[in-house]
UniProtKB/Swiss-Prot annotation:
GO terms for biological process: protoporphyrinogen IX biosynthetic process. GO terms for cellular component: cytoplasm. This is Glutamate-1-semialdehyde 2,1-aminomutase. Its cofactor is pyridoxal 5'-phosphate. HAMAP family: HemL_aminotrans_3. It comes from the Bacteria. InterPro entries: 4pyrrol_synth_GluAld_NH2Trfase (IPR004639), Aminotrans_3 (IPR005814), Aminotrans_3_PPA_site (IPR049704), PyrdxlP-dep_Trfase (IPR015424), PyrdxlP-dep_Trfase_major (IPR015421), PyrdxlP-dep_Trfase_small (IPR015422). It comes from Bordetella petrii (strain ATCC BAA-461 / DSM 12804 / CCUG 43448). One of its GO terms (molecular function) is glutamate-1-semialdehyde 2,1-aminomutase activity. Homodimer.
Length: 427
């Protein structure tokens, strides 16, 4: 049996950094990544046969828990009929119809294979439909790794984009304005200066890539209003929050209709599926109807779509989201109580089946605030919990996820471990 360390050494010889997505490398927390060989319900097992309670959940898709038998059966049955056709299928039509039925803002849907593809296409579509070049995104919001969205904010109220990744020429992001999340005044100022040139605003309506940051009161409605006023496209990136925080995502909770929505994660049930959808007049600009090109060999893959359909059927059961939110709240309430009892500066927040943990006195509202958290305390907490069989995301800037299989016994086992960890941290 290979150890995690042996596998990581081996991986580093054939894969850059030993991983196929950077956060998996444990660089921000140190130590050796756990190589997972199987998962079931709320648990994952590594190559050393150590079991962990899992709050990563494949970074969000595993809302039903890992390897739900109905989803696995749907994948098995679809695979028996063929893995990929490169042609239209009944199942992809059914998935599009389900998404349109569930989300009132969707009139038409285009399936892709990832969240990055969905957001990249949504930006291109907004630019093509409006004939404008500039886009607004927010500091700390992640929308995949396409060039125009790999931007961080600089100083000043209105900041023209600077690359935040090597290999992205400055001119590629020169039309990207990066503003502070939850700062509506900055958005209004940007439109006052550049309104005729702004194609769209793209936002995580609840940010999940700078830990969990909720929108301030009036922020999302303000974005809706300013986009409507200036004829810009409002894009809700619900890749993470779609069907994770409620049956209609954040847009349903907030009562706001974006013009375009991007989806992934839950809608694939653990398989690679993404989607963008929205107003029919905008979607009509996509090829083959319009001049905005988008294509994909595996878009609408029948096996992945089968997993998505099975998942969406199961999460539509009455009471599903109420129970999911209750379990998530049980976790965050319990962690807060135990940290307080130990005298550890700690805050937690939750929405639906998502949560954020912060080693600071209050819940942050921006990237700057979340960055002020105690990074060393998080590292100590992460490794101590991992040693006690609890698997959180290996970064202080990632949200966590609860599944339908995280019952009271699982949550309470997590809290027992946390109580011991907080006590040790204080001591």
């Amino acid at each position: 049996m290979s150890s995690n360390a042996q596998l990581f050494d081996r991986a580093c010889r054939s894969i850059p950094g030993g991983v196929n997505s950077p956060v998996r490398a444990f660089r921000s927390v140190g130590g050796t990544p756990r190589f997972i060989k199987r998962a079931q319900g709320p648990y994952v097992w590594d190559e050393e046969d150590t079991r962990y309670i899992d709050y990563v959940g494949s970074w969000g898709p595993a809302i039903l828990g890992h390897a739900h038998p109905d989803v696995v059966q749907a994948v098995r049955e679809a695979a028996l009929d063929g893995l990929s056709f490169g042609a239209p299928t009944r199942a992809e039509v059914e998935l599009a119809e389900v998404l349109i039925e569930r989300l009132p803002s969707l009139e038409q849907v285009r399936l892709v294979s990832s969240g990055t593809e969905a957001t990249m296409t949504a930006i291109r579509l907004a630019r093509g439909a409006t004939g404008r070049a500039k886009i607004i995104k927010f500091e700390g919001c992640y929308h995949g790794h396409s060039d125009s969205l790999l931007v961080k904010a600089g100083s000043g109220l209105l900041t023209f984009g600077n690359p935040s990744s090597a290999g992205v020429p400055p001119e590629f992001v020169s039309h990207t304005l990066t503003l502070e999340y939850n700062n509506l005044a900055a958005v209004q100022a940007a439109f006052a200066q550049h309104g005729a040139d702004i194609a769209c605003v793209i936002v995580e309506p609840v940010a999940g890539n700078m830990n969990l940051i909720k929108p301030a009161a009036g922020f999302l409605q303000g974005l809706r209003d300013v986009c409507t006023q200036h004829g810009a496209v409002l894009i809700f990136d619900e890749v993470m929050t779609g069907f994770r925080v409620g049956p209609q995502g954040v847009q349903g909770l907030a009562g706001i209709k974006p013009d375009l929505t991007t989806l992934a994660k839950v809608i694939g049930g653990g398989m690679p599926v993404g989607a963008l959808g929205g107003r029919a007049d905008l979607m009509a600009h996509l090829a083959p109807l319009g001049g905005v090109y988008q294509a994909g060999t595996l878009s609408g893959n029948p096996v992945a779509v089968a997993a998505g359909l099975a998942t969406l059927r199961l999460i539509a059961q009455p009471g599903f989201y109420e129970q999911l939110a209750a379990q998530t709240q049980r976790l965050t309430d319990g962690l807060r109580q135990r940290a307080r009892a130990a005298g550890i500066p700690f805050a937690a927040d939750a929405i639906g089946g998502m949560f954020g943990l912060y080693f600071q006195d209050s819940v942050p509202t921006s990237f700057a605030e979340v960055s002020a958290g105690d990074a060393d305390a998080f590292k100590r907490f992460f490794h101590a919990m991992l040693d006690r069989g609890v698997h959180f995301a290996p970064s202080a800037f990632e949200a966590g996820f609860v599944s339908a299989t995280h019952d009271n016994a699982v949550i309470d086992a997590t809290l027992d471990a946390a109580e011991a960890v907080f006590a040790a941290m204080k001591g």
